[in-house]
Amino acid sequence: NIMKKQFVIGAGLVATVAAALVGCATGPSSPPAAKAPTDAEIVAIMKASFKDSPSARLTRLDQSPLQQACTEASRTGKPLDDKLREQLQAAAMASVKYPTDGKYLGDWKRGEAIAQNGRGLQFSDAPGATAGGNCYACHQIDKAEIAHGNIGPTLWNYGKNRGQTEPILKYTWTRIWNTHAYNACVNMPRFG
């Protein structure tokens, strides 16, 4: 008899808790979410939050056709169609300016300093100030540097592993100048 009472009380408690939970799940909840802002509204907010300066123009916020296509591909989850991707990559390849003297390599110490430097193209910079590459933000280049990113592939021993033939040097130059020549929607910025 006592066990029956305990079972009935337990079952009643479970039923009460279940009813309360169902009420929470189906009852009024928080107010409906606000309508998501449009792309135009987002761009207007971004532009209003930046100052135009000689070293950092507001036009930098205007997307190129490549950026527009890649933004749309990212938003929809649909990759670029082959024809558009090929057109965008061909335009990127055409933008590359190779060294007129044919020298792809320079002072490696100066190159290391540029790779380490993340400064540049900020509104507070003097017009024409040299910008750094900030390569270490995404790549490992030297094993001695422990503060490096891993978004991009390691570049440790890049030249040693690949050699310094004309095709490799030209490929590397192109990758740095405008990496979109090889991958339209890559995250690496253009440095040319």
Model-derived regions, located:
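Bacterial N-terminal signal peptides that target proteins for export
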Residues: I2-L13
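Post-cleavage N-terminal segment of exported redox proteins
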Residues: K4, A18-L121, R175
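A short alpha-helix capping/helix-coil boundary motif
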Residues: L13, Q87-A90, N150-I151
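Residue-level signal for alpha-helical transmembrane segments in multi-pass membrane proteins
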Residues: A15-G23, K143-I146
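Extracytoplasmic electron-transfer domains, predominantly the class I c-type cytochrome c fold
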Residues: A36-P37, E41-I42, S49-S53, R57, ...
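A glycine-rich, coil/turn loop motif that links secondary-structure elements
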Residues: D101, P127-A129, R190-G192
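Local sequence-structure signature of Cys/Sec-based thiol-disulfide redox active-site neighborhoods
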Residues: F123-N134
